[in-house]
Regions:
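Broad gene-expression machinery/nucleic-acid interaction feature
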Residues: 36, 263, 312
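Charged/polar low-complexity intrinsically disordered segments
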Residues: 16-20, 28
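Conserved glycine-bearing catalytic or ligand-binding loops at nucleotide- and phosphate-handling centers
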Residues: 248-254, 258-287
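A broadly conserved detector of short glycine/acidic/proline-rich loop/turn motifs that flank catalytic sites
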Residues: 176-177, 215, 270-272, 295
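A conserved regulatory-domain signal marking ACT and ACT-like small-molecule sensing domains
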Residues: 279-312
Length: 312
């Protein structure tokens, strides 16, 4: 599928995605290519160097297919919890069990997990002959409000990433973070890398956003609890938002909201399927679940899925 790039935006122009959120990515200077894809890999997918190498193989598959690629990564599994523990230990007042800390320093420490992963993945990709570099949130920049620890993205300037796409370079982006009005690192809260990926996909006008996890799609209910749970081929943004709000752990609620507002076609896929497995290179119908506009779903089911919370 050949991709027709839109005309360059007027200088200073930006597209509003939500009140107060501007997307500044343009397609200036690009030649036609097959597609532009944002790929996101969670903590279990990048838990160690062996798994990071597997992630790199997934990325290389898309690059070898002629696609422009940005990759958003989480911290390695367990690393964020470890960093939070360090913050709590370091901030204990002498002779007290109270943890009183500066939220800006908390963010500076906790955001480092994603920074490590992005650098490691860029190195592995380079070792495979792929032109890649790592990007921190402040370098792009991904701008946020000032709510340190639970910040919201206000705008993303994707113009430099788009320029690098035109040069054939893969952008490996540290998820979960941006830069606040105070020019300090601000983290987006738990699950924030999903939001980073969808917002980036909207900013650079990606054709698709692939969320790679340890499951191979969205199921009618938790397959670990109900063996007869069925994987859905497609689910609407509205249905996914409702399931996420009710406790489904596949995607963070905020990421689904952004995908729905900006019509970002989002696939939930497994990073543990071999990159060269049958169908993995199928652009239109890869294995997994497509989260899309309701108009793309021909037949609506009365009940799409069941979500529940274990502690209720």
């Amino acid at each position: 599928m050949e991709r027709a790039h839109p005309a360059p935006a007027e200088p200073g122009a930006s597209a509003q995605i939500l009140p107060g959120i501007a997307l500044l990515g343009t397609s200036q200077g690009l030649v036609a290519s097959m597609a532009r894809i944002v790929m996101k890999f969670g903590g279990t997918s990048v838990a160690d160097i062996a798994r990071i190498r597997n992630v790199a193989r997934h990325v290389k598959r898309e690059v070898d297919s002629g696609h422009e690629v940005a990759v958003v990564v989480s911290a390695m599994a367990g690393k964020t919890n470890e960093l939070v523990g360090w913050v709590q230990e370091a901030s204990k007042a002498e002779g007290s069990n109270l943890n009183i800390y500066d939220a800006r320093e908390y963010d500076a420490v906790v955001a480092s997990g994603e920074q490590v992963t992005s650098g490691l993945l860029a190195l592995v990709l380079q070792s495979m002959g792929v032109d890649a570099r790592s990007w921190q949130g402040w370098q792009i920049p991904v701008r946020t409000d000032n709510s340190h620890g639970a910040a919201r993205i206000t705008d993303i300037d994707g113009s430099e990433l788009v320029r690098r796409f035109g040069m054939g370079q893969v952008a490996v982006v540290a998820g979960f973070q941006g830069v606040g009005p105070d020019n300090r690192i601000a983290t987006l809260g738990r699950g924030g890398s999903d939001t980073s990926a969808v917002a980036l996909a909207a900013a650079v006008k990606a054709d698709r956003c692939d969320i790679y996890t340890d499951v191979d799609g969205v199921y009618t209910t938790d397959p670990r609890v109900e063996p007869k749970a069925r994987r859905l081929a497609k689910i609407s943004f509205e249905e996914m938002l409702e399931m996420a709000s009710l406790g489904a752990k596949v995607l963070q609620v905020r990421s689904v909201e952004l995908a729905m507002v900006h019509k970002v076609r989002t696939f939930v896929r497994s990073s543990f399927v071999e990159p060269d497995a049958p169908g993995m290179g199928d652009f239109d119908n890869p294995p997994g679940t497509l989260i899309c506009d309701e108009d793309e779903i021909v037949e609506q089911q009365v009940v799409t899925g069941i979500a529940y919370a274990k502690d209720e």
